[in-house]
Structures are given as C-alpha cells and as structure tokens.
Amino acid sequence: MKLLAVKVECSHELEDGLSFFMQDELDAQGIESRKRSDFVAEGQKHDSSLVELDDIENLPKDLELTAYFNYENADKKELVKKITDKIAEMKGYGLNTGEVSISTKEVADEDWNTAWQKYYHVIDFSRHLAIVPEWEDYHPAFSDQKLIRLDPGLAFGTGGHTTTQLVLLAMERALVKPMSVLDIGTGSGILAIAASKLGASHVLGTDISDEAVTAAKENIALNDVNNINVRKANLLKDIDDKYDLIVANILADILLELIPDLDSHLNKEGKVIFSGIDYLQLPKVEKALAENNFEIKMKMQEGRWIGLLIARKPD
C-alpha cells in the first residue's frame, strides 16, 4: 500500500494538538514526530558535543510532524488546507506556531514501518510502569514495575505524548482496587494495557478507527493480559454497560461532546480521567462538567496540557 506523507514544520507548542487533529479528525494512519530538543537532550545525556547534531539527517529547526495517509483515499490539497486552517486556529488560542511549512510526498508503506522505529525507545515512566518497544530488551528497574510492550505500527499512542503521560499518572492513583475500565479512543491500546497491568478487573477499549482497533489488538497480544476487549465505537454510542473508571485522552472539543453521556455509563462510585485539554480550553470543560453534576478531584498540568481526575458531585 502506498502512503501520502504530509510533513509539517512548526513550533513544538503545536505537537500534541496537531497530532491529535491529524489522527482523530483527518484519519492519519500514523504520526512521526522529530523535535530538535530531543536530539540536543540526547547529546547532552551522553556528553556529546552539539557539533555531532550536524551529522543528523535533516535535523528540524524545532518540530517536524509527519502524518501518513492512505494514498488512494487522500486529497492532498484538502489535507494541506485543513492542516493550515487548524494551525491558524491554534495560533488564535495563543500558541506560538513558529515558522510553518507544509510539504507532501508519496512513500511506500514498508519504508515508514521500519524507518520510524529509530526514534522510539523505552520510556521508564515510573516505579510502576515502563513503556517498552517490542523489539527492545529491557529489564524492570523495580521489582514491581510493569512493562507495557508496544509496536505502535500505524496507530497513535506511543506513551511519549504529555497527554498520555498525564492519564497514566492519574490511573496510577485511581486504580487502587480491581475496577472495570472503559478507554475511549484507545489508539495503540496503551492506556487499556496500562489499566490491566495496574490491576483493572476488565477493560474495554474503543476507537472510531479500524486501523487503531487492529493495532490495539496486536499490542494487547504482546502483553501478558487476558482481560481486555477492543472494538470499534464512536465515543459512548453503542456502549451499554457501566464502568468504574472511564478514560478519554481526546481533544477538548470532543470531550465536551462526551460529558453529557458520562453519568449513564458510570457506576455509583465511578471516576473519569480526561486528558488532551489545552489550558485555554479548560474553562469550557470545567463549566460543562459542573453543569452535568461532576467535580474535579485532581488537576494535573504539564506545559499547556491539562489532565483531570473527575467524580460526581456528592449528593
């Protein structure tokens, strides 16, 4: 299968928001991210001189995001226009867009599947969790550390995004006993797998993307878990059961659509974890939660991104 690669060079402030948009709204089959700061930090960690950065091929000025689309179905001009419009919208939120350029090219599927792996390494997240690419050999840093093995393939969610890490942090605090968990927009399945590893009794992961559902199932198979189901669904549509914990790492506008339906899908003492919220959009989310009888129990922030642990207001 041929792919259309759309490369966006811009400020690192756009990374999470633009990645979400291209994955969830434009149906990108994969996102590759390269930040200059990552290479600089890696060089400093190994006491390398910055001169060595000159040897890295096409080192980005700041951030380089490359989204991959099915070539046969992609409308090149329309994709570029939508991305351009989204960047203008994000600039309106107050984000620094930097010097923006957008380019496209045709690539072979198998070229991307192997090339991106060199940018993905172990994330030693906490004493409880480490995220490990399935091709790397890694031994837990702590005796009780759980490993999440991933081959992200063509689906979003490697564990490197700030928004994902905020959810993981909240899950470590919320999953204090066996709980049923619903992971909305499961992507690569990373949060569903993490929930299982942290002691969930049962997990359902859903996604609107067929490719994400397939990738999540493949990643689940890499891990020693047998209590996760994955299926295609649009938010809470066609979800009949109630859960102890609902997790959604999605853009704020989509979270706003989700909020009115939370109560009917949450058990009595249930909790909700949201991430993917730019701090400028937090007031809208807070207002919608309050109007639907929810309160924020814990708020986490990393840079511009907000994560929330939510529960019903007491009677």
Swiss-Prot record:
<dbReference type="InterPro" id="IPR004498">
    <property type="entry name" value="Ribosomal_PrmA_MeTrfase"/>
</dbReference>
<dbReference type="InterPro" id="IPR050078">
    <property type="entry name" value="Ribosomal_L11_MeTrfase_PrmA"/>
</dbReference>
<protein>
    <recommendedName>
        <fullName>Ribosomal protein L11 methyltransferase</fullName>
        <ecNumber>2.1.1.-</ecNumber>
    </recommendedName>
</protein>
<comment type="function">
    <text>Methylates ribosomal protein L11.</text>
</comment>
<feature type="binding site">
    <location>
        <position position="164"/>
    </location>
    <ligand>
        <name>S-adenosyl-L-methionine</name>
    </ligand>
</feature>
<feature type="binding site">
    <location>
        <position position="185"/>
    </location>
    <ligand>
        <name>S-adenosyl-L-methionine</name>
    </ligand>
</feature>
<keyword id="KW-0949">S-adenosyl-L-methionine</keyword>
<dbReference type="InterPro" id="IPR029063">
    <property type="entry name" value="SAM-dependent_MTases_sf"/>
</dbReference>
<keyword id="KW-0963">Cytoplasm</keyword>
<keyword id="KW-0489">Methyltransferase</keyword>
<feature type="binding site">
    <location>
        <position position="207"/>
    </location>
    <ligand>
        <name>S-adenosyl-L-methionine</name>
    </ligand>
</feature>
<dbReference type="GO" id="GO:0032259">
    <property type="term" value="P:methylation"/>
</dbReference>
<dbReference type="Pfam" id="PF06325">
    <property type="entry name" value="PrmA"/>
</dbReference>
<dbReference type="GO" id="GO:0016279">
    <property type="term" value="F:protein-lysine N-methyltransferase activity"/>
</dbReference>
<comment type="similarity">
    <text>Belongs to the methyltransferase superfamily. PrmA family.</text>
</comment>
<keyword id="KW-0808">Transferase</keyword>
<feature type="binding site">
    <location>
        <position position="249"/>
    </location>
    <ligand>
        <name>S-adenosyl-L-methionine</name>
    </ligand>
</feature>
<dbReference type="GO" id="GO:0005737">
    <property type="term" value="C:cytoplasm"/>
</dbReference>
